[in-house]
Structure formats: C-alpha cells, structure tokens
Amino acid sequence: MTQGRDPKHIKRLRDLVDGVLLLDKPVGLSSNDALIRAKRVLNAKKAGHTGTLDPFATGLLPLCFGEATKFSQDLLEADKTYEATVHLGIKTNTGDTEGEAIETAPAGVVDAVTDAQIEAALARFRGPIMQVPPMYSALKRDGKAYYEYAREGITLEREARPVTIHGLEFISYEAPMLKIRVTCSKGTYVRVLGEDIGAALGCGAHLNALRRTQVGPLTIDGMITMEALQAHAEPLTLLAPVDALLASFPSIELTAELAVRFLQGQRLALGKEAVAVPAEPGRVRVYSDGKLLGTAQLQEYAILAPERLIAKAA
C-alpha cells in the first residue's frame, strides 16, 4: 500500500487543514452545499460557515476549516455589508425573485419616484430600527421553520426585532431598479429592508439581487469562485490564516513561559512578561513567537482569562 492511500496518512493530512476560505458564492447554490463542495476539494476533516447566504444571493461566504471553526461564531455576530438591487413596483410573497408577484403598483408610479424621495425614504431606516422577520426564513416555531408554514399557506404572527442599519447608501436609480449599499447588524433581513423601502415610497418592492461584500473584518479582497477553487492545483494555498477572523480584536504577545500556562487554561496576571498590552479591557488575540494561541478576555488589573484555544499553533 502506498503512503498516499494509507488511511492514517490521509487522516493526518485532513487534520492539517486549518484556515479560512473567502468564497464568492454563486447564485443558486445554498451555503451548506457550498461548504460541502469546498470541504471535499480541500479534503478537510472539520468545516463550518459563518452565517448563511440565501441561494439567490452571491458574494462573500467565509468558510472555516479545522481550528478556524472555533472562531466562526465571531463572524455570526459580526456586522455585514451588502449591495442590493431593489425592484420597485412589484411585491412578491418571498420578498425576492424566487417568489410570486402578489402586488403591482399602478402604471407610472415607479417612473415618478425621484432621487429626493428615495433619499428621504432611506433616511427612515438608518440607525436602530424594528424589523419583522419574513415568513420565508429559517426561523423556527414549535420546531418547524417559518418557510415550511409559508409553503403550506400559513402566515404566523411575528414580533418585530431590533436591528441596526449602520449604513444605507443610495447608489443609483434607473426605474424600476434601485441600487443600495447596506451595512447592518446580525439578524437583519435585507429582503425585508427592500420591502420596507418600497412601502415607504408607496409602490411596493422586492429584492432583485443581493451581493455580500464584507463580513466583520473580511472583505471581497482575495475572494475566489467555486470554479477556480475546484480547478486550482494547490487549493490549500488559497486559505487565509485562522486569525483573519479575529483581525478586529487587539493583540497581545506572550513570552514562551506564559504561553505554556495560557495553553493550559490558566488565568494570567500580565506584567513585564507580556508586550504591548491593550489599554482597555476586552477581547484580545493572543500570540507567542508570532503564532496564534487563541483568544482571551483582558480584564481589569491586566488579568488575562483564556477563552478559545488553538490545539496547535497557527
């Protein structure tokens, strides 16, 4: 038996796959299917994504492999940026192009919408808002997804939830297509935002296209298509390091002695043995000799409390 076919050797190779793939998800592919395909190409043992994109949406889908999966929750909680095309004048039952038209504005209404009206409408949705989640969503009630109820013709009462629209930029309007850029908090449905903008303009709307361009500190720079991934001779070279997920947190460098204690899960009182301790308490990246050890909470009086640890230095 050759080493290349030795199951133990293959397992060792799979265990070595650590990092983040910045995938440009295509239209029509679910986030889970994208993850399965990428995991197969990379021959990875452990994989996870950082929050789903609807099948009709495209753009940045960060996929985590190996040790990076320990930190995927950080991007689930992170702010996200999208470029969206809102089709004014037609409302669908799903809020996007996959649904059926249920309302159509009278002729001429959409053509009469002005840039000033759009700017005024967008201003209403900047900052903290309350948003009612859509029926066509993966939220659950009594163990059953909302979209399953919707497909049965059942509409549930849904409570509005607080979300924050950090940025809402008017890009262009060529009737009936309105292009916007949205930066929003976790839990925001851009489909619903598009519908609400249409309602504010008095003409109804649905989302015609959606492209995600940023998730937390990760941007479209270095993003790769599924086709390019599958065709690449050395796909593992496409992975960003694990700490790419944590770039928004300040860092601490530990001596070798402190690093051993940190990896044992010990709380550390930092003194001269740590370099460049952040001034404010909070979450930090922890390194030793330039290698990521994990994350921790920097507490008052320079106490470092381990949080998530890397099994092998990254």
Placement of each model-derived feature along the sequence:
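Glycine-rich loop at the start of a catalytic domain that most often binds anionic cofactors/ligands
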Residues: 60-70, 75-79
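Short, charged/polar surface micro-motifs in flexible loops or helix N-caps
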Residues: 28, 66-70, 90-91
